[in-house]
Amino acid sequence: MAVTIRDVAREAGVSVATVSHALTGYTDISVKTRQKIQETARRLGYQPNVNGRSLASKKSNRIALIIPDLLKRERKDNVTFRMIQGVYGYCSSHGLEVAVYAHDPEEMTYRQFCQSHAVEGILISDMITEDQRLQELMEIPVPFVAMHSECLAPEQSIGMDNAAAAADMTRYLLKNGHRKILVAAGSEGSMEQADRMIGVLSAMGQENLSLQEEDILDWEQGENGENAPITGEEQQAYRKMKEYLSHYGTGHHTAVLCFSDYVAFGIKRAIREAGYRIPEDFSLTGFGDSSIGEYMEPALTTVEWDPLDCGYAAAKLLHERMRQKKDTERSFIPYRIAGRDSVMDRTNA
């Protein structure tokens, strides 16, 4: 026989209304009581009846998690999976239903999408700088939050402070004596790339340094190289770095600052295949898109963050907007510079 909300209330020694409020995110319940009820519900195996609650409130309590290029992604990363875990972690403890969609806005508008799927809110990832979806999302009566993005509406975004993180990584290299830095920026057009470049330029400008065209490796989204043995951003970084090395060799730059761990993986392969060493010939840094950089040889210096925190915080912000319709300030998830073996100290060189 299925466990009911009354069973949870009886076991926890509280009223049915208190259990309902604790499991649906109301703030009139103390933290201690909420934790006790949640632990009791988990122990008994209670599953909230989302459909029943939706009928009573005439709301679906359903969140759409939209990852537009989910079916087209070539890279094998755990960022998306960890963000989904974070979203589900919040929603499962607050009585919300979440469904993942690989929605193509060219096939159906967001207004049509919300109507056909009866969603009360939208979480969307990977918005690019000139994203036409943003204006459409602003016009529909359904709250949304951009995840792992910094869209043009600050109160509707959850992500890392990319400019600050890139500036910190640049300062880390400068502090270690690197003044000839090659920036492997990756695919053009993303908000992340633009903000990270702002951070790099800011930190270098503070040292009266600048970047020239020859100091940047980037490429158009979807650009592919031929005969490269790896895929996605790694493939493109590998190809671009091979071209760079054939033209400049070593000595022109002492460090490569990558806007993605996956870009760093491609850069590393090109450097190794050309017979150069990391960090003796090129120091190398990434930007926290993976959890495997620390297992590289040498271990990759990178910007670390947890996508699970991003997913959880995004779902929480969206839930607040669904319930209270309030605008809040943009929240940034924490990060840190993980200094490892891929950067050589050249201060005395």
Which residues does each predicted region cover?
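N-terminal helix-turn-helix DNA-binding module of bacterial transcription factors
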Residues: 1-61, 344-349
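Short, solvent-exposed amphipathic alpha-helices that sit
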Residues: 36, 78-93, 191-211, 236, ...
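Alpha-helical recognition/docking segments in bacterial nutrient-uptake
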Residues: 62-171, 175, 246, 250
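Short beta-strand elements in bilobed, periplasmic/extracellular small-molecule ligand-binding domains
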Residues: 91-102, 201-234
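Periplasmic-binding protein-like
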Residues: 120-125, 182-184, 229, 233, ...
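Hydrophobic alpha-helical segments within soluble ligand-binding/sensing domains
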Residues: 158-184, 193-205, 233-246, 264, ...
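Flexible loop/turn connectors
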Residues: 238-349
